A protein has these predicted regions:
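N-terminal helical cap/lid subdomain that shapes the substrate entry/recognition surface
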Residues: 4-128, 132-133, 148
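Asp-based, Mg2+/Mn2+-dependent phosphohydrolase catalytic module
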Residues: 1-10, 14, 20, 27, ...
Length: 265
């Protein structure tokens, strides 16, 4: 029988917990990013091939993963600079014109909405049940290549944003999981003590270790990384690389979000 926790709030991870990604969607977003960057760079008089941009984007993956593992953040513009510098062999091509930079940034983040991850099929019902039982509901997300404002818009489009009392995105607060302070920020925004919160996520380091360091209860959503993500240098596979080598233990494990209700009073 599952242990039951007396909590007043539940927080969710975004990627591979609330929203599910696929290698096909991930590749499509990367294609759209490179196409958009190439088109906008051409308008600025910078000739760079799609292939060189794609190589730059691939090279950025381990760089980003190493930074994010430490809970640090890289802005959209910094990511673009890295990719373009690699693609152009470090020629300084990004101008300071705000409108031009805004167009470059939009071409980079907009694929999060044009080729979006899919809402977990169990999420709407579970969120509704939590709301009916007066639990506070929060989201704690490491944003990756898609910024918080884009992911929040995706939640709105899928009809789940209004269930949340707080949505915390790492690019907006300036730090990410597994840092303790992003979980403490969530608790403060929900008006609860960390000990009153159950955090649900798929990453043993980012979600379980991080939430436990703040004093939260944890459920590990046991979602297997699709083989396609392991066959290419994806951020998902790289951030999960240490999961099998950890001594961290969650308070419970689930294979479906609907199981959350079995753990809370």
């Amino acid at each position: 029988m599952a242990s039951r926790f007396r909590v007043a709030g539940v927080t969710f991870d975004f990627w591979e917990t609330l929203f599910m990604d696929t290698p096909q969607l991930d590749r499509r977003r990367d294609e759209l990013r490179c196409q958009g960057l190439q088109e906008n760079l051409t308008k600025l008089g910078v000739e760079v091939s799609f292939e060189d941009l794609a190589n730059g984007l691939r090279e950025s993956t381990p760089w980003l993963a190493n930074i994010w593992k430490k809970g640090e953040q890289v802005s959209t513009l910094e990511q673009i600079r890295y990719i373009v510098n690699h693609a152009t062999k470090n020629r300084q091509v990004l101008l300071s014109d705000p409108e031009a930079l805004m167009r470059l940034e939009e071409s980079y983040w907009s694929p999060s909405l044009t080729a979006p991850a899919k809402l977990n099929a169990d999420a709407p019902k579970v969120l509704q049940q939590l709301r009916e039982r007066d639990f506070k509901i929060g989201l704690i997300c490491n944003t990756g290549r898609g910024p918080g404002h884009a992911l929040r818009e995706l939640m709105r489009r899928e009809g789940v944003l209004d269930y949340f009392d707080a949505t915390i995105f790492s690019d907006e607060v300036g730090y990410g999981k597994p840092e303790t302070r992003i979980f403490l920020t969530a608790a403060k925004m929900l008006g609860l003590e960390p000990s009153e919160i159950l955090h649900v996520g798929d990453n043993i380091e980012n979600d379980v270790r991080g939430a436990q360091s703040a004093g939260m209860r944890t459920l590990l959503f046991e979602y297997e990384v699709p083989s396609g993500f392991r066959e290419q240098p994806s951020l998902l596979a790289l951030t999960r690389a240490s999961d099998s080598n950890t001594s961290v233990k969650p308070d419970g494990r689930i294979k479906s979000l609907s199981e959350i209700l079995n753990f809370i009073d």
